[in-house]
Amino acid sequence: MKEIINKFVGLSGYQIKRVKYLYDPFQNLIKSINYFNVKSIVDVGANKGQFVNKLLKNGFKGNILSFEPLFDEHNYLKKISKKKNKWTIEERCALGKKNSNEKIYVSGNSESSSLLKILPKHTDIRPDSKIVDTQEINVKKLNNFKNKIYKLEKNILLKIDCQGSEMDVLIGANKIIKSFSCIFLEVSLVNLYQKQKLWLEIIKYLKKINFEVW
């Protein structure tokens, strides 16, 4: 069958070959950080510091400001960041489009926790993401932290990984969004959380505020 397909495709001057899987999303991010000469990172949804630790292992030496809403994870971050003089853990809070008091749904795997209720589509694929607890949390706009962000060395990357609330974080950063040279965020093709905004709506919003897909 491969020979038949190759003969057919070969009529157009192309050939299909098996190649090793070379694409590494994180290495692509590192290359982008270097390309944009990123000196500081605002890390929204730090969880247990997985993202930052990978950055540090890949040689990033700039300032990092991390936000994490979960109680245990926030305490853990404060502990491990003490050895990193350029890594600051901000007060325990969630980030959103308005200042409020909310309930965060805590998943069994921690990293799937969200201000939005998780849908069966998610838990069917990852049973460890089921809600096991809730916590009361202050939700604040990223705008509230403008003075700290303005002090960061430019260029600044904004990283958002908050399980369905990415659009709300962007809206809550509307007054300082021009401070960021680039934005790295997780988007979803399908609804995994109630009321979450999907990839196309987020991309349209980013284009509206003069960012483009890289």
PLM region spans:
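Membrane-proximal basic amphipathic "stem/tether" segments
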Residues: 1-35
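General small-molecule cofactor/ligand-binding pocket signal
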Residues: 17, 89-91, 214
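SAM cofactor-binding core of SAM-dependent methyltransferases
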Residues: 22-109, 119, 189-196
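Conserved acidic-Pro-Pro-aromatic motif
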Residues: 38-42, 51-56, 60-66, 73, ...
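Conserved residues in the N-terminal Rossmann fold of short-chain dehydrogenase/reductase
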Residues: 68, 91-93, 136-139, 159
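A short helix-to-beta-strand connector/capping loop
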Residues: 83-89, 132-133, 153-154
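Glycine-rich adenosyl-binding loop in Rossmann-like folds that engage adenosine-containing cofactors
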Residues: 96-140, 144
